[in-house]
Amino acid sequence: MTELWSLENEIYDAGVSPLCGVDEAGRGPLAGTVCAAAVILPRGAVIEGLNDSKKLSEKRRELLYDEIIGTALAYGIAFATVEEIEEKNILEATFLAMNRAIEKLSVRPALALIDGNRNKGIAVPSRCVIGGDGKCADIAAASILAKVTRDRYMLEMAEKYPQYGFERHKGYGTAAHYAAIREVGPSAIHRMSFLRKMH
C-alpha cells in the first residue's frame, strides 16, 4: 500500500495539494457508455487490497467500491454517452467523461493525476501517469469506482437487451458478442463506429 502512495507523497511534499486520481472504464467495448471517476483520498489512506481494478475479482471490486466511497474526501463519477462517442470519437468522449467527473468533486484539486499517456483535454492542471491504476492510490481508487459503476450500468443494459449477453462480457468484443450482433443486428447502445470492421 505504501508503494501506491510514493508518487503522490512526492507531489504532496512539493506543496501541491489536494491531488485527485482520474481513470476510465469502457473505452474498448463495442457497446455502452464510457465511464470516468475522479477521487481525492486523504493522504496516506490505507485501503487493503487497493490495486488496479483489472486485477481484482468482481466481488472484491464491489467491496472496495463501498470502502472508497466511505474513505474519500471527495469523488465524482460521470459518463459520456454512446452518441457522444460516435459524434466526437472515443478519446474525446473519454476526456469529456473525465472532466464531468472532476467537475462533480466537492473539493477542487490542485492537480489531477490521469491514468495513461494523454491529458490534453483535461480542464484542470493535470499530469499523466502511465500504468497509474497500479502505481497511484488515487488513480487505483478511481479505476475501481469507474469499473464498478460501468459494470452496473451494463447489467441494466443486459435486462433491456437480453439477446447480447452484456451481463457476461460488459459490451466487450467477445466471440459470443460478435455472434449475437450478426444474428440480431446492433442495439441502440452499440457503437456503430466500432462495428465497421465486422465482416
Please report, for each region that a protein language model flagged, where it lies by residue:
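RNase H-like, Mg2+-dependent phosphodiesterase core
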Residues: 1-199
